[in-house]
Amino acid sequence: MDRSMFEIDHKKDEQLVSVEGYCKPGSDLIQGVQFKTNLRISEIIGFEKAIFGNPTTFSLAEDGKKIIGFHGYSMANLNSLGAYFTWISPTKMEAKGGKGGTEWNDGAEHEGFTKIYVQGGCDGIQYIKFDYVKDGQHKYGSPHGVKGSESTEPFEINHLDKEYLISVEGYYDEGDSGVIQGIQFKTNIKTSELIGDKKGRKFSLAANGKKIIGFHGYADKNLNSLGAYFTTSPLISLEHTTGSDLVNHIWDDGSFEGVRKVYVRYDSLEICYVEFDYDNKGKVEKREHGMFYSWVQQGEFVVDYPNEFITSVEGTMRTESFMQVASLTFKTSKGRTSSTFGSPSDSKFLLESKGCGVVGFYGRCFSSIFDLGAYFRPLPPPSNTEKVEAKGGDGGASWDDGGFDGIRNIYIGHNKMGIAFVKFLYDKDSQIVVGDDHGSNTLLRVDEFELEHPGEYLISVEGSYDVVDGSESEVIRMLRFKTNLRTSQLFGHETTPSFILEKECHKIVGFHGKIGKMLHQIGVNVLPITD
């Protein structure tokens, strides 16, 4: 008797969300099952196809919930299967806006939305109301603020068509009124018009890879502030399959934050090998599939993650004898297209989901790639940050922390060659975000520069770089940081500055660069100063 196991990694916040099953025609015998988590999908355990007749199928799933247990009936075989569900714990994002009004909270136990009503007035947004879906039923929400006499056209969300809310952008008055002035909603399919005025301080409610399932905030005669509850957005899987039962090596990378790089090896007939560099919360994870032949052609495609995502994969198939993937082409959210790897045929396929980016791949292979599928999630809202080009040498591997609201702490490790380690503590929505370690702080002296956030912010970085003994490319030798209030001590070696990273009327809210055994490059991400 064959045994199979599908492991779920709770350390990655992976949760079982559904089970698909296949029953033998004319009986209650379950002949195959397939498990789906919020991150990946298992192979089919057992049989999907029946020898006589088509199997009946069943699904165990409840929107917005996870499976926490099973029940069923069995004798010599498994005859029935049921599941116990509970709500997936949401993430609460604090309310953005002014401090006035009375607190309200719609809660988070919803699957999604059907309609959003918003009414503007002379002083800003007067009124907001959300109609939710709970346990598959329409739930009318409570109004927040004061509704005027004018009729309000709702922003409709087609929950039945798997449409869901992924972000809210708006503006609020920082003066005494503290009222939200304008607001705009974005789903995985469309974006509403801006309701109200584009004035005041801009805010955003969004979380990469998550959807909004509820709101909270403060209101009186107007809407003073708005916050949201998030849960993991559905994972979309698309595949091209030959349907061949002869290829038995199934692989599934699962899903990550995004794709950083793609490597392909190919000859004139087929794609022999693929390798993907994924981003796993700032760390690179490699996955490789197929046969690594050293004598065939090779190519790579680098993605500027987190500012860029692969949005589609175009491929062709060999149709003689076995059907192998003959060519692959990748397109990104920035409108870039990779080289075509392989020799295209007339048999084409496309992996693409509108408004989404690729976060993982799966497929079948042996001596070449036979089937290919991809996991998609909605693209994150475009960042308002601007990237200032990194300075330094070309050594090491690229890293990019992205953009936040500000900088809280800077940690610098240095040795006799220069800067070997950097780490930053950021601020996002008044919460501390711990950046990744870049380099190794083992046996190094690590110094700290702490900013008095939120009143103090970083406006420039000056430094120097040079070739030193033991390094083939230039390394960062010195760094010094300047805020709106003061200048830090010098980190590293006393040398003449050779670069300054800054942009007029902007503050630094993130860092990027290249790191190996030493820091080779450093650059910054900036936002306009609005304070």
From Swiss-Prot:
Residues 1-87, 90-232, 235-378, 385-528 form the Jacalin-type lectin domain. Pfam families: Jacalin. The keyword Repeat applies. InterPro entries: Jacalin-like_lectin_dom, Jacalin-like_lectin_dom_plant, Jacalin-like_lectin_dom_sf. One of its GO terms (molecular function) is carbohydrate binding. The keyword Ribosomal protein does not apply. Keywords: Lectin, Repeat. Belongs to the jacalin lectin family. This is Jacalin-related lectin 16. The lineage of its organism: Eukaryota, Viridiplantae, Streptophyta, Embryophyta, Tracheophyta. The gene is JAL16.
